[in-house]
UniProtKB/Swiss-Prot annotation:
Gene3D superfamilies: translation elongation factor selb, chain A, domain 4. The gene is RPL35AB. It comes from the Eukaryota. Coiled coil: none annotated. One of its GO terms (cellular component) is cytosolic large ribosomal subunit. One of its GO terms (molecular function) is mRNA binding. The keyword Nucleus does not apply. This is Large ribosomal subunit protein eL33z. It comes from Arabidopsis thaliana. The keyword Ribonucleoprotein applies. GO terms for biological process: translation. Keywords: Ribonucleoprotein, Ribosomal protein. SUPFAM superfamilies: Translation proteins.
Length: 111
């Protein structure tokens, strides 16, 4: 029997898009706020600085043989004291991404 044996291994951590960085009346869509699963303090966020993010979504038309597309980003800094991070994406995240999942990859490593 050919194929993969054993359990599947996930090489990323799940995160949730909370929204754009904002003030009381303005929002700044070039910076997005992400809550990473299992990260609850500002000290834990420091390990994720510089790590790559991917927002994967499904489109109606095919491009390069796939309906799935991806917007890449990078964790830039912490936001507050409860494990939320600020991140910048290559193009601003669409409004439908609020509450959606992102993948937080374990590279580039700074160990």
């Amino acid at each position: 029997m050919k194929g993969r044996q054993g359990e599947r291994v996930r090489l990323y951590v799940r995160g949730t898009v909370l929204g754009y960085k904002r003030s009381k009346s303005n929002q700044y869509p070039n910076t997005s706020l992400i809550q990473i699963e299992g990260v609850n303090t500002q000290e834990e966020v420091n390990w994720y600085k510089g790590k790559r993010l991917a927002y994967i979504y499904k489109a109606k038309t095919k491009k390069n043989g796939s309906h799935y597309r991806c917007i890449w980003g990078k964790v830039t800094r912490p936001h507050g004291n409860s494990g939320v991070v600020r991140s910048k994406f290559t193009s601003n995240l669409p409004p439908k991404s609020m509450g959606a999942r992102v993948r937080v990859f374990m590279y580039p490593s700074n160990i």
